[in-house]
Amino acid sequence: MKVSYKLDLSELPRITRKMQDELYRELKQNVQQAAQGVSVQAKQSAPRDKRVGHGGDLHRSIYYRVKDLTGEVGVGMPYGPYQDFGTGNKVVVPPGWEKYAMQFKGAGIRNVNMTPQPFFYPAVNVHETKFNNECEKSISKVMTKRR
């Protein structure tokens, strides 16, 4: 009695190329959704000038762009971080943002203590978790698909 095992790997390059292409498309879509999601939520949460009824320059300066598997979301106005974290003794330092937010804390030349109006970092935090979960799902989906 005996058993033989033989592997035919002739189809392996085609299958791995196909998997790579599928995974690339899935992950690119995840990057697009995450970047757009952060941008939309940040715009919705950005402080608004109640006198004019819209977000003004800060709101309009929030952008996102995606190239391949890289997404970038930003705030184009230099005062954006001051709005997000506050200034002086009113700075709020959220977990995970210590290195960046601490630059706005402390006594400066002027006694300007601006209360934070978080809009950007909460959006990043929400969508970062979603992004990680969606990437895991995409990888699992592509890897378990029958070929």
Predicted features and spans:
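Short, Lys/Arg-rich flexible segments
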Residues: 1-80, 92-147
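Short, conserved beta-strand/beta-arch hydrophobic-aromatic motifs that form part
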Residues: 83-86
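Short intrinsically disordered coil segments
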Residues: 88-90
